[in-house]
Each structure stands twice: as structure tokens, then as C-alpha cells.
Amino acid sequence: MAEKVDYAALKKGGFMRQKQKGCFSLRLAVVGGNLTAENIKTVAEVSEKYGHGYVHMTSRQGIEIPFIKVEDINVVKEELAKGGVGTGVCGPRVRTVTACQGSEICPSGCIDTYTLAKELDERYFGRELPHKFKFGVTGCQNNCLKAEENDVGIKGGMTV
């Protein structure tokens, strides 16, 4: 007899049902929009092996790998973890924190957005809430990340 699939638990762990029967799109955790070359290689390898070679870049600096079969979910999570890539979340939870490049890279950056995004993510990511909740960190007055479009938006600034 086939195992019963717990769709709610899968969604909580970042696996969203697709219209194709037995297939899921996996949302990955990409904190502050930052990935290492090793992370990108891992995502590409997993996508080639389990996701038809397709990767979707989301509007919130995230990555999704569609076409993952239900029977491959555990091995996909294991292979991603080996490459330092975590799964995201869906539903009424704190989502992965987004951030611009900040003072480490951008000439206009006033704050270290990536460190702040990591700290917020470590503290709040995945917490259950009544509704999905989003943080965004932008490093300066240019507001390239559009901080006000998040539930909590942080903007770097200067005192003159």
C-alpha cells in the first residue's frame, strides 16, 4: 500500500504542489539573495537530476526547483544539505529575509545588509504566524529593495 502524503507538512517545508500529479516545486532558502558558487552548483546538479533541469528565480530573491517527484523529496533535501543549501517555507510563516548588496558591495550602502539579514533569518525564519510574514533590508536611501513592500522593512541611512 502506498504511503499517505502529508501535503501540509511538505508545504511547511517549502514543497508546493504542482498541477502535474505527484510533482512539487521546492522553494529554497536564499538569505539576503546570497549564494556561494558551491550552492549554485548544488542547485544546478539537483535541478538536472530531479527537476528537469529547470530553476525558477522568484521576485523575492529566491530559487524554486519544480518537477520534483514525491518519491525523490528526501534524497533532494539530503543532496541540497550536502551542498549547504536549505529549503524554504510556505504558508503562514516568516519567510526568508531579502536584502540588497549593502555597504559590502554597493557604493551607496550605509549598512551591512547581509549580516543583518542573516541575523534576522536565524532568529525568525520559519516561525509560525497567522499569515506569511516578510522582512526586507535595504542599505541606503535609494531603496532598491523597496523596504516598504515588506511587513518589516529596514532602510540604511546616514546622520548628517
Residue map of PLM features:
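Small-residue-enriched alpha-helical segments and adjacent helix-cap loops
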Residues: L26-T159
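N-terminal basic/disordered segments at the start of proteins
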Residues: M1-T42
